[in-house]
């Protein structure tokens, strides 16, 4: 019975924790063991992002254990805007740790998207470890259009789901509000914006006062509640800047929720024309320029005019590329073959 070591043992509601839980559940269904102890003997070792247990990785490598490094994006927003010295140092240190594991310890590298792979190649150059792209996956039986929840008939509901829109990740929050405001001007029905993410109290108060559309802040939402939220909305707005491979977008697609966003990060890879609308950014996202919200709102209006077709397209896209079983098979090939 193969044993896979997975480090670090991330917890919470973020993408890394969600991925770990899905992977471990899939391995268990196949009768495989999972450990988080680097000292235990294992057939393969998966590093999700970074870990400070570098000595343990060295020991595992000397034992002949295959090390697979799963990479997300590179910390960059701290360079694009004024931030605290503590956040700047933390971001740079994390980048150096990831680059070290990728170059010195990994036997295989998994990039979450073509965008992520190309980004790492540009910033830190090629490495000896073979690399492959594996998109994130979701349980298509849980994230599904089937359910009791339906969008309101007398209003338009825009959905945003992120782990955090704070601590250096808040740039997408005014974009979400601006998109909702621009879309509301094109709608005959009232519009509301729902944001399921960590948002500071100050930001909540600000947008509650100055937004021209109603904004409901739901806070960090348990992952088991996300499918119902997605099913209850008309359209999803992708608020992350240069998203590497956003789980929330894939979850929305699986629930039949069309996605609206800008052509940055991995979004053009994930959201095909039949699954939503992706438009040119209209500036430089790496400099956090203000995007072309008007063009996106116009494109979203066309999606809402043919919502049943786009709902079906979103679900079809998820079924074709983002099933968790397909993701698991690809990881097993990298880990064990």
Label for each model-derived stretch:
Residues 204-227:
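Nucleotide-activated donor-binding/catalytic signature segment of Leloir-type glycosyltransferases, i.e.
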Residues 291-295, 305-335:
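A charged, aromatic-enriched C-terminal amphipathic alpha-helix characteristic of glycosyltransferases
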Residues 228-233:
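Short alpha-helical donor nucleotide-sugar binding micro-motif in glycosyltransferases
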Residues 246-254, 259, 266-270:
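A short, glycine- and acidic-residue-rich donor-binding loop in the catalytic cores
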Residues 241:
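Aromatic "clamp/platform" in nucleotide-sugar-dependent glycosyltransferases that forms part
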Residues 149-181, 194:
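Conserved donor-binding/catalytic core segment of Leloir-type glycosyltransferases
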Residues 101-130, 138, 142, 205:
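A short, active-site helix/loop in glycosyltransferases that binds the activated sugar's phosphate group
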């Amino acid at each position: 019975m193969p044993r896979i070591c997975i480090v670090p043992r991330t917890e919470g509601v973020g993408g890394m924790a969600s991925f770990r839980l899905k992977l471990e559940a899939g391995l268990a269904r196949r009768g495989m063991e999972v450990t988080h102890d680097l000292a235990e003997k294992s057939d393969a070792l998966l590093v999700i992002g970074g870990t400070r247990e570098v000595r343990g990785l060295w020991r595992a490598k000397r034992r002949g254990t295959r090390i697979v490094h799963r990479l997300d994006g590179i910390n960059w927003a701290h360079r694009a805007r004024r931030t605290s010295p503590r956040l700047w140092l933390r971001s740079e240190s994390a980048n150096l740790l990831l680059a070290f594991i990728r170059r010195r310890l990994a036997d295989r590298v998994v990039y979450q998207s073509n965008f992520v792979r190309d980004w790492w190649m540009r910033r830190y150059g090629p490495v000896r470890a073979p690399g492959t792209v594996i998109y994130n996956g979701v349980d298509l039986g849980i994230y599904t259009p089937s359910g009791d929840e339906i969008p309101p008939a007398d209003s338009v509901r825009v959905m945003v789901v992120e782990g955090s829109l704070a601590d250096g990740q808040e740039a997408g929050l005014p974009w979400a509000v601006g998109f909702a405001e621009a879309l509301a001007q094109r709608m005959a029905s009232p519009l509301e914006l729902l944001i399921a993410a960590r948002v500071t109290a100050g930001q909540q108060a600000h947008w509650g006062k100055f937004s021209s559309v109603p904004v409901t802040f739901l806070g960090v939402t348990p992952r088991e509640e996300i499918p119902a939220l997605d099913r209850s909305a008309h359209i999803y707005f992708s608020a992350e800047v240069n998203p590497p491979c956003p789980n929330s977008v894939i979850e929305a697609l699986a629930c039949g929720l069309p996605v609206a966003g800008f052509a940055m990060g991995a979004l053009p890879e994930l959201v095909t024309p039949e699954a939503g609308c992706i438009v040119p950014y209209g500036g430089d996202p790496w400099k956090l320029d203000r995007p072309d919200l008007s063009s996106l709102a116009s494109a979203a209006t066309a999606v809402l005019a043919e919502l049943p077709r786009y709902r079906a397209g979103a679900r079809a896209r998820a079924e074709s590329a983002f099933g968790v079983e397909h993701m698991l098979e690809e990881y097993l090939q990298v880990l064990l073959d």
